[in-house]
């Protein structure tokens, strides 16, 4: 571990992560104008947030800091790539990791690996979909747009909340905390379409005040000690590419998983590539649509 990394990472093992995140959630709901307006102005300057992209550019119009952080953008701020059978990025950020999965093993950083089984909360059967598949990790910093959108047309299958730690998910922590994405609190969201299945995972982090989806509402910060599961197969919840599906407060990470051969370009994106929601990530490989994923979810 690098000298400076030691002082950035080790304290995270010692602090009350969930208590601090609940405190951040409370602070982000403060409505006193002089507090929330000055906080927004300060952080806009520190993180160089482009307020001109916002649907509402007037800081005073946001009821609290959370409303600003999850602000809507102007309709033309994030055009959705129209390429047929292509995935667009579900979020703003950088591609912090893009890889072909080796069996069930994913590389987090040099000397650090984690397994599909662990990432997916111990769901060994579901993990079989993604053996030798492709994966991309998008890191959202505090300056980024914090709404999550559909990468492609699909039907919602199910969702699982997995409790866990709340380490930061910045590059320093990724380098030094083993199995970070498989140990942090997360939402595992399963989708299916005519191409088969895919998975989008929202990973929590320290000071991420809450995670929420449009179909289930706010999931955190009410920490749950056990895995929670929701099945939507009977609800017929279908979404189009570019539809909003969830939100983060502050910054965090989205992990995408695709089965082997379905989205080969997903695992070949250059590391640290900046990306905006709506820009193309990769395209589905051409194949006979009558041949469906043999591990189609049940």
UniProtKB/Swiss-Prot annotation:
Keywords tagged on the record: Cell membrane, Decarboxylase, Lipid biosynthesis, Lipid metabolism, Lyase, Membrane, Phospholipid biosynthesis, Phospholipid metabolism, Pyruvate, Zymogen
GO annotation terms (biological process): phosphatidylethanolamine biosynthetic process
Catalysed reactions, semicolon-separated: a 1,2-diacyl-sn-glycero-3-phospho-L-serine + H(+) = a 1,2-diacyl-sn-glycero-3-phosphoethanolamine + CO2
Endpoints of the signal sequence: none
EC number: 4.1.1.65
Active site (record annotation): 92, 149, 252
Pathway annotation: Phospholipid metabolism; phosphatidylethanolamine biosynthesis; phosphatidylethanolamine from CDP-diacylglycerol: step 2/2
Task of the protein: Catalyzes the formation of phosphatidylethanolamine (PtdEtn) from phosphatidylserine (PtdSer).
The protein, known as: Phosphatidylserine decarboxylase proenzyme
Native source species: Hydrogenovibrio crunogenus (strain DSM 25203 / XCL-2)
């Amino acid at each position: 571990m690098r000298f400076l990394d030691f002082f950035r990472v080790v304290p995270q093992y010692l602090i009350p992560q969930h208590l601090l995140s609940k405190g951040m959630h409370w602070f982000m709901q403060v409505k006193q104008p002089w507090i929330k307006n000055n906080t927004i102005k300060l952080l806009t300057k520190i993180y160089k947030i482009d307020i001109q992209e916002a649907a509402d550019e007037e800081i005073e119009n946001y009821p609290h800091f959370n409303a600003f952080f999850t602000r809507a953008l102007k309709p033309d701020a994030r055009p959705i790539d129209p390429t047929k059978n292509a995935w667009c990025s579900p979020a703003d950020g950088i591609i912090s990791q893009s890889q072909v999965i080796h069996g069930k093993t994913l590389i987090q950083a040099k000397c650090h690996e984690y397994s599909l089984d662990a990432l997916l909360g111990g769901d060994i059967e579901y993990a079989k979909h993604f053996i030798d598949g492709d994966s991309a990790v998008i890191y959202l910093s505090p300056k980024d747009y914090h709404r999550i959108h559909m990468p492609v047309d699909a039907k919602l299958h199910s969702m699982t909340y997995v409790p866990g730690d709340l380490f930061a998910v910045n590059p320093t922590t990724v380098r030094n905390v083993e199995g970070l994405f498989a140990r942090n609190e997360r939402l595992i969201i399963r989708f299916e379409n005519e191409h088969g299945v895919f998975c989008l995972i929202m990973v929590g982090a320290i000071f991420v005040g809450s995670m929420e989806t449009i179909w289930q509402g706010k999931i955190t910060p009410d920490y749950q000690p056990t895995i929670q599961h929701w099945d939507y197969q009977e609800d017929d919840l279908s979404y189009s590419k570019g539809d909003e599906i969830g939100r983060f407060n502050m910054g965090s990470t989205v992990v995408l998983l695709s089965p082997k051969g379905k989205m080969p370009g997903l695992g070949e994106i250059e590391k640290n590539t900046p990306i905006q929601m709506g820009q193309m990530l990769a395209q589905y490989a051409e194949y006979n649509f009558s041949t469906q994923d043999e591990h189609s979810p049940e």
